[in-house]
């Protein structure tokens, strides 16, 4: 019985360590990648630009994308 409990605890510890390594080893978000839920996760040469989606003047959504620093996008009509 003690062996089963010990084995279970060891397996739990190993799985926890593997998950922690995966989370800490994640790379940054690349150019034009979505950063809505993680605004600080863009690569070092990029910034997270956010845009409000409006319908009849009311905000219905917010979307963020990693874009180049010092670059301005304008709507072409």
Curated annotation (Swiss-Prot):
It comes from the Eukaryota. One of its GO terms (cellular component) is extracellular region. It holds the Pfam family Toxin_35. InterPro entries: Spider_toxin_CSTX_knottin. Residues 1-20 form the signal peptide. Residues 21-26 form a propeptide. GO terms for molecular function: toxin activity. Keywords: Disulfide bond, Secreted, Signal, Toxin. Contains 4 disulfide bonds. Expressed by the venom gland. It is found in: Secreted. Its main location: secreted. Belongs to the neurotoxin 19 (CSTX) family. 10 (U11-Lctx) subfamily. This is U11-lycotoxin-Ls1b. The lineage of its organism: Eukaryota, Metazoa, Ecdysozoa, Arthropoda, Chelicerata.
């Amino acid at each position: 019985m003690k062996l089963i409990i010990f084995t279970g605890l060891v397996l739990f510890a190993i799985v926890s360590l593997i998950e922690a390594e995966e989370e800490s080893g994640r790379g940054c978000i690349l150019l034009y990648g979505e950063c809505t839920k993680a605004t600080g996760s863009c690569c070092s040469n990029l910034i997270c630009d956010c845009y409000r989606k409006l319908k009849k003047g009311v905000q219905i959504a917010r979307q963020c994308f990693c874009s180049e620093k010092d670059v301005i996008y304008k709507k072409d009509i």
